[in-house]
């Protein structure tokens, strides 16, 4: 099983993954977990991954472009089951865990700020 995690804080994710049950599972070759920095796919020189929401509103929203490019790199252009981790979504439970366990590869998208660009959610999230 391969789990890719799209995040702005890969070092934090990797630290937890090395020191947990998942770390032992990785050592045994049961699962491969990789955290990828979304900023690495920003096209500007400052690696900007956020901006004010289109149409106004408060806060910052993660930009669609670096999200798309990161997702494309991780999925290799193939459909890979993608989950956006958000407080607005359905609660994670044992049934959802079993569904993910059946996947050979899936991508977890960690949001930040006020959220992420809805266009990315509509296009890439299952």
Task: Please place each PLM-identified region on the residue numbering.
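N-terminal nucleotide/polyanion-binding subdomain common to many enzyme families
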Residues: 1-74
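Hydrophobic/aromatic beta-strand patches that form the interior of the parallel beta-sheet core
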Residues: 4-6, 34-36, 81-83, 106-107, ...
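Generic recognition of short, well-ordered alpha-helical segments
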Residues: 16-20, 95, 119
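Short, solvent-exposed amphipathic alpha-helical segments in soluble enzyme
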Residues: 20-24, 98-102, 123-124
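S-adenosyl-L-methionine/SAH cofactor-binding core of RNA-modifying enzymes
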Residues: 61-112, 117-118
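Structured adenosyl-cofactor binding patch, chiefly the S-adenosyl-L-methionine
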Residues: 116, 120-126
């Amino acid at each position: 099983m391969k789990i890719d995690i799209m995040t702005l804080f890969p070092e934090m994710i990797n630290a937890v993954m090395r020191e947990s049950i998942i770390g032992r599972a990785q050592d045994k070759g049961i699962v491969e977990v990789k955290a990828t920095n979304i900023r690495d796919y920003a096209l500007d020189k400052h690696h900007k991954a956020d901006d004010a929401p289109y149409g106004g509103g408060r806060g910052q929203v993660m930009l669609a472009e670096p999200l798309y490019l990161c997702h494309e790199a991780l999925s290799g252009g193939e459909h890979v089951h993608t989950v956006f981790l958000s407080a607005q979504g359905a609660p994670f439970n044992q049934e959802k865990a079993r569904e993910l366990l059946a996947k050979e590869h899936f991508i977890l998208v960690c949001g930040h700020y006020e959220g992420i660009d809805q266009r990315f959610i509509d296009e890439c999230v299952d």
